[in-house]
Amino acid sequence: MNPLTVAHALKKEEEDLLQQAGVPYHALSFTEIVPLTIDWPGGHFDYLVISSPQVVQCLLEEKPPYPHLLLVVVGEKSAARLKKAGYTVVHQAARGALLSDFFQRHCKECYLFIKGDRGGSDILTLWQHLKINYREVIAYRLLLTPYPLNVQPGALVFFSPAAIECFLQVQGIINVPVYCIGPTTAAALPQGILA
C-alpha cells in the first residue's frame, strides 16, 4: 500500500489518529510562514477580523493598540485561543464564507482585517460587494517551499491552496486520489481533478 501524503505539517493529535487507524503516511510542509512587524493603522475600527491560526499567533505575540476591540474569527480553535488570551470574540465561523450573514447585519461598521499575503479573498470579495468600510493589514508572508516527493503517494491530502500550487510546481501532475480540507482548498485544484 502506497502511503498517504499529507501536504501539511501535522499536529500531534493528527499523527496519532493516522497511526491508530494504521494508515501509512508522509507529512510534508510545502510552505513557510514568515511573520512581519504589524504596522497598525490609525483610526477607529468596530471589529477586528481574524481568518487564520497564523494571525492568532501574531496577536498573541503583539497586542493591537485598540482598546475594547471586538473580534470576528474564522475557526473554533482560533476563537478559543483568543478568548483564553482575554480577547472578546463576538462571532465565529468554520470558514470565511460562513461569515456572510454577520457581515450583512453589520455592513455599516468599520473592519480591520489582519491576514497573510495570500488568502482571505472570499471575505474581501463579500466586503466589496456589500460596500463595507475596511482596512487590510498583512501580518505574515506565506512562502512556497517546493521540493520533489521521494515516494509515490497512494493519495494526497491538501490543507491549503498554496500547498496545491507548490506541489504542482514540482510534480506537475496529480494522478492519485486527492482529499482537500475545506472548499477553498478544493477550488484550487486544476480542472479535471476531483477531490
In which residue ranges do the predicted regions lie?
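Signature of uroporphyrinogen-III synthase
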Residues: 1-195
